[in-house]
Amino acid sequence: GFAFFLAWELTEDHPVVDLSLFKGRNFWAGSIATAIAYGLFFANVVLMPLWLQQYMGYTATRSGMVMAQVGLLAIVLSPVVGKNLAKVDPRKFVTFSFLVFALVLWMRAQFSTQTDFDTILIPTVIQGIGMAFFFIPLVSITLSGIEPHRMAAASGVSNFMRITAGAFGTSIATTLWEDRAKWHHVHLVEVVSSGRTVTADALTGMQNLGLTSPQSLALINRWVDEQAFTLSAIEIFYASALMFLALIPFVWITRPRRGG
């Protein structure tokens, strides 16, 4: 089916999806860079509030207060980026953006279940800088050199790839988060249940406070879950940071025309 689709679209005079756009280096490299970067960005935007609400004790409102700050610097800096886009190589803007995203994700990879609100907030604010230098320059690179009559088709294909990558990125990230958390949970349980004095003392202390044995075990399991899902989130943050860095050479494959 897919082979038939390719053959049809490549030979049709008026194709629904103009695959010949991918003959242009700027378009295919820019579209792929945009799709992967957006998938990483959106996956982490979804993962953060899930972790905060489920394992850090944040309410939906409080986690929303953390994530909403990402727009502050983006709103301020986006007009500056747009104004200077014709003067500066957009690849430099995108490179700076990916470095900022990598820094933000590295900062998040230092989180623990004891991390306070302000420490969690700082990377989110900084992420706004990356957003300002991300979307506008990448669109400029992707559409650079496209003939005016093909601009609508090129924009549509690029946006479709970006939105699809966002959906895939979210699904992959949340699935990996849960799978890796299960792995960490198993290994943490082995440590907790290995007959250590600390575990026995903790159970005794909780039972002295009036908790039954099942309640004490359930509470310890909850603590193990918190650590397991936090470790899993940290792994995803690290991996995402490395992927943003890996995308930087990919951006420099393109040869955008100055000013778009």
Pin down the residues of each PLM region.
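Hydrophobic transmembrane architecture of multi-pass small-molecule transporters
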Residues: 139, 161-253
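Hydrophobic alpha-helical segments of secondary membrane carriers
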Residues: 33, 157-161
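Perimembrane helix-loop junctions in membrane proteins
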Residues: 12-13, 58, 181-185, 251, ...
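Transmembrane core module of solute transporters
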Residues: 1-153, 259-260
